[in-house]
Every structure is written in structure tokens, then in C-alpha cells.
Amino acid sequence: MQFDLEPGDFVINPKNKEGGTGQIQSIIKNKITVNFQNIGKQVIDVNNVVLEKVKINDN
């Protein structure tokens, strides 16, 4: 389970980088709902995928 993530964080799915950057909408137990820029809303099981946190520049 990934404890360093919280709603509002931006992530990428290393198993599906074509999905683009996504913003975490919710975390419930081992399920993370992410709204990805290229593929829309996805529910990720963190037992199967380790999401990579990315930093978004506000400039």
C-alpha cells in the first residue's frame, strides 16, 4: 500500500504512461481513484500498481 499519496496529488501509472498525468480524487483502502488527462477516471488497485508521484510546477 502507498502511504505517501493523498487526494490532490499528481501521479503517473508506470504500467500505462500513455494515460498521462493524473490527479488523485480519492483513496479508500487499497483503491485509488485517479482522473488521468488522456484516459479519464480510473480506479487503481495499489496491490497491482505502484503509482509514481510527480511534482507539477505552478509557474
Range-by-range predicted roles:
Residues 32-37:
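SH3/SH3-like beta-barrel fold
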Residues 19-27:
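Short beta-strand-centered aromatic/proline hotspots
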Residues 1-16:
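Short coil-to-beta transition motif at edge beta-strands of beta-rich domains
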Residues 4, 21, 53-55:
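Intrinsically disordered, low-complexity N-terminal extensions of nucleic-acid-metabolism proteins
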Residues 40-59:
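Intrinsically disordered, low-complexity, charged/polar segments
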Residues 5, 38-39:
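Charged, low-complexity terminal tails
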Residues 28-29, 46:
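Residue-level signal for tight coil/turn positions that link beta-strands
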